[in-house]
């Protein structure tokens, strides 16, 4: 990870930092803006913390239903195992329920807001970094500010709601370049950009005159395909 990155807001070396990651929101933002999502969460947390005392990173998402898609459940378990091995990172999982035939998140936003507020009330951090662009967190952000805490919202500009942008003390704006040195694996210049299960998706780099090499099929790649089928839960 580069030490030369300039953050979008003033950094105080003595402020205690807690990081709250809305996993589904981050996943879809990375898909949209970077066409990949295989972040090294340890390196990501370190970049966000920027050398300040780091209490912990909290990652929130929905637990897949093994009865609905067992392979997707197994792939998610492998992904979660990797997260559990990341130092100072806690995984918090909500459930999903069917609304008709469509699975919807249940309880994840409440989990994030509750931890966000509880830790501020208990004076466990000075600065909270909320990795989400979801405007539903606006009131919780204001409540944390009223407790005397500093709140940084980290998101891609195109995915940051107006309400959340206005209430945050500071913003950390993501770009594809922001993640260039914190991907969990390295790829060559050419990669299939098939994000709609279309083999003729966009390519990066000059195409080979021979049949294009298919990218390695990893757990995260399989997770993406199941996400597209299962209402995009990551």
Which residue stretches match the model-derived regions?
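Nuclease catalytic cores that cleave nucleic-acid phosphodiester bonds
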Residues: 81-198, 203
